[in-house]
Curated annotation (Swiss-Prot):
Name assigned to this protein: Non-structural protein NS-S
Similarity comment: Belongs to the hantavirus NS-S protein family.
Gene: N
One Gene Ontology term, aspect cellular component: host cell nucleus
GO annotation terms (biological process): symbiont-mediated suppression of host innate immune response
């Protein structure tokens, strides 16, 4: 029997770990001419531009609905302002 096979007790630490979502996603991996592995990473935010645009449309619709109903809009947070700024640059 191969001595390098892992025993069940050694994998206990790995079994306790849970998958956590990352902020980066591997979009492409290939080998260069010199044989080195080249990996292209992209933030999850960039990979979901379609859903991001849908979210912006919904957000604008809700804001306009609140305005038409005469309700005062809540003060937008700095995060929302940065988000709107990012969408205007696209």
């Amino acid at each position: 029997m191969n001595s390098k096979l892992s025993l069940p007790g050694k994998n206990l630490k790995m079994q306790k770990r849970r998958w956590k979502p990352t902020r980066m996603m591997l979009t492409r991996a290939h080998y260069r001419v010199d044989g080195q592995l080249c990996q292209h990473w992209r933030t999850n935010w960039q990979t979901s531009r379609g859903s991001l645009q849908i979210w912006c449309q919904v957000k604008k619709w809700v804001k306009s609905l609140l305005t038409r109903l005469g309700l005062s809009r809540m003060i937008t947070s700095r995060r929302d302002q940065a988000f709107d700024m990012e969408m205007s640059l696209m």
